[in-house]
Amino acid sequence: MNAWKQLRAILLLPGMVTVVIPATIIYFTGISQPRSIVIGSFFILVGLALMILTNRLFTTVGHGTLAPWNPPQKLVVRGVYQHVRNPMITGALCILLGEAIFFGSWWLLAWFGFGLILNLIYIPLSEEPGLVRRFGDDYLQYMQNVPRWIPRLTPWEGLSEPAELKQEGHRNE
């Protein structure tokens, strides 16, 4: 995997959502005194850990990036994806919530709420149907066994070798 492709995907998507826009909000609205540095830092660190783990899995297992123009070519159902279907979004939302708590900013809390609502709508209505088209029955089986948002306590061991995309965008039979 080309390191530049990976870095570009990280900087453009989660970097924009979790760093550039919150920094702009703080710049224009002012910084309140940090009310809860420990709690805010905890959420930020959990979010960063999830983002790093999921990006690494997309590269090493999925042979792609989080960017829509270079998505994983294999369905990723290892690591944190054995517990929950959307750990990358969970990581980004943890970072946004942590920033709101850390800075004591209602504007950043509103930005977190916007991101949460957007993903609660987008994931089931757009992303999941697209993944069903790309990976077929394997993704349907994954959806039935791994929750969208609340992690399972035990890892799901259902797919030993997940689907890989054909050139025309359908899973291998």
Give names to the regions the model predicted.
Residues 1-81, 90-173:
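Membrane-anchoring alpha-helices and their flanking helix-loop junctions
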Residues 86:
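Extended, alpha-helix-rich binding/interface surfaces that flank or overlap catalytic cores
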